[in-house]
Swiss-Prot record:
The keyword Ribonucleoprotein applies. One of its GO terms (biological process) is translation. This is one of the proteins that binds to the 5S RNA in the ribosome where it forms part of the central protuberance. InterPro entries: Rbsml_bL25/Gln-tRNA_synth_N, Ribosomal_bL25/Gln-tRNA_synth, Ribosomal_bL25_b-dom, Ribosomal_bL25_C, Ribosomal_bL25_long, Ribosomal_bL25_short, Ribosomal_L25_dom, Ribosomal_uL5_bac-type. The gene is rplY. SUPFAM superfamilies: Ribosomal protein L25-like. The lineage of its organism: Bacteria, Pseudomonadati, Pseudomonadota, Betaproteobacteria, Burkholderiales. Keywords: Ribonucleoprotein, Ribosomal protein, RNA-binding, rRNA-binding. GO terms for cellular component: cytosolic large ribosomal subunit. Belongs to the bacterial ribosomal protein bL25 family. CTC subfamily. The keyword S-adenosyl-L-methionine does not apply. This is Large ribosomal subunit protein bL25. It holds the Pfam family Ribosomal_L25p.
C-alpha cells in the first residue's frame, strides 16, 4: 500500500491543532540512518487507509518529496470521542534488518468443520493477531489458520499453525503453545455429558 506524506515544518500543540483544523494529521517517521522527520498527511486519506487491515500489518510505501520510503505503521493516537487522528508514527524499514510486528490471524473452514456442522459447537477465537519476527520481504499481511478439521475434542494451539517461510512467532511467558480458539459444546449436550458421568461413591461410615 502507498500513501503520500508532506514535510511538516512546525511542531508543538498549537501547530498540531492548526494542522488538524486544516484537514491534515501530524505525524513522524523515524528509524534507519536518517534523522526523524516531521510529516503531515491528508486526514481523510489517512482515516480511510487506517480502516484497512493491511495498513496496520504490512510494509507501506511512503511518498515524501518525490521519493518512496518503505515504512511500518507503529502507533496511532485517536481523539477520545471524535473521528479524528491526533498523531501517527511510522518507522523506516531496512531490508536487511528483521522486523517485529503483529500480524492478523484469519480463521478459515470453521463452518464446515465437524465441531460446528455436526456437533453444534461454538468456536470462539482467543487470539486475533500474532507477534512475528522476520525479514521485511517475508512479512505476510495475515496468517491463515485452518479450522476445517476441528472436532469437539480438538485442541488448537499455536504450534498447530503452519507459519510462512522465514516467519517466527514471538511468544512471551512460559506457555509456548497458547490456545488459539475455544470449543464449547451446546448446553444440552454438555448437560447430558455431565449427567452420564459416574456418580462418586458414597463415603463409608465409620464403625461405632
Amino acid at each position: 500500500m502507498q500513501f503520500v506524506a508532506f514535510e511538516r515544518a512546525k511542531q508543538g500543540t498549537g501547530a498540531s491543532r492548526r494542522l488538524r483544523i486544516s484537514g491534515k494529521a501530524p505525524g513522524i517517521v523515524y528509524g534507519g540512518s536518517a534523522e526523524p522527520q516531521l510529516i503531515e498527511i491528508d486526514h481523510n486519506a489517512l482515516w480511510h487507509a487506517l480502516k484497512k487491515e493491511a495498513f496496520h500489518s504490512s510494509i507501506l510505501d511512503m511518498e515524501l518529496n518525490g521519493q518512496v520510503t518503505k515504512v511500518l505503521l507503529r502507533d496511532v493516537q485517536y481523539h477520545p470521542f471524535k473521528q479524528q487522528v491526533l498523531h501517527v508514527d511510522f518507522q523506516r524499514v531496512d531490508e536487511k534488518t528483521r522486523v517485529h510486528l503483529k500480524v492478523p490471524l484469519h480463521f478459515e473452514g470453521v463452518e464446515g468443520s465437524q465441531a460446528v456442522k455436526v456437533e453444534g459447537c461454538t468456536v470462539t477465537p482467543l487470539i486475533h493477531e500474532l507477534d512475528v519476527m522476520c525479514m521485511p520481504a517475508q512479512l505476510p499481511e495475515f496468517i491463515k489458520v485452518d479450522l476445517s478439521g476441528l472436532t469437539s475434542k480438538s485442541t488448537m494451539g499455536l504450534q498447530s499453525v503452519k507459519l510462512p517461510h522465514g516467519v517466527k512467532a514471538v511468544v512471551r511467558g512460559s506457555n509456548k503453545n497458547p490456545a488459539l480458539v475455544s470449543i464449547k459444546l451446546p448446553e444440552v449436550v454438555a448437560d447430558a455429558t455431565a449427567a452420564a458421568a459416574p456418580a462418586a461413591a458414597p463415603a463409608k461410615k465409620g464403625k461405632k
